Amino acid sequence: MARQFALADVIGERDWSVDLGAGAVTFGDDLRFPVQLLGSESHGDNTWLWAWANEASNLPPALLHLCAWMRDYGRNAGVGELTDRTFPLTRADGHRLALLASGLTGRPYYRGPYAGGALFFHLEGVPPTALPPERALTVISQTISAFPFDHRTGVTAFFEQQGWPFSGGVAHHPGGATINVAFDDQGRISQLNGSLPPRG
C-alpha cells in the first residue's frame, strides 16, 4: 500500500494511456514508464483473467514476464489463484493480486479502468518516494482493514521497507517522528498511534 500512495503522489490526476507495442504507459504529457501486464477484471461476468492466459488479445510476450513469473511462483507455493487462468472476483480481485505481486517485486501497480473492466499492470522505473510519516498510520490502518495477513510480520516488513528502525513496538523515522504499535495475544494490532516532531 505504501508504494501505491507514493505512486499516486507521482502521477496525480493525470490521464493514462497504454501502448502495448511500446510496452509503456503514459500519464498526461510528461510521465512514461515501462510496464509488465498482470491481468484484467471483467465487470460483465465478474471474473479475473491472467494476462498470460489472455490468448485472444495476442499480447506481446515481452510484457508477460511478470505474470508468468507469478504463475511459476504459484505452482511452487501451491497458490491456485496464481495458476488458474481465470476465476470469480469473489475469490480474489485485481487489487489483491496486484498487491501480492507488488509485495514480491517491490514495484507499484496501476488499475486502468476501461468500458466493461479494468487492466492491471506493474510499472517499472518509478522514482522512489519516501512515505511522509503522517501517511504511515493511514497506510497501516487501511491495509489491515482491507486484507487478512499477519499484522506483526506485515508491520515489521513495512517499517523495514520504509527504512524506519522498529523495535519494542516503536518505529523511529529519521526526521524524529515515532509510531507506536501494540499487538494482542493473537498478533493483531491492538493499538496504533504516533507523534510528529514540532515544526520549526
Describe the residue ranges of each PLM region.
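Glycine-centered tight beta-turn/hairpin loop motif at sheet-sheet or coil-to-beta transitions
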Residues: D30, G116, P174-T178
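Alpha-helical oligomerization segments
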Residues: P132-G200
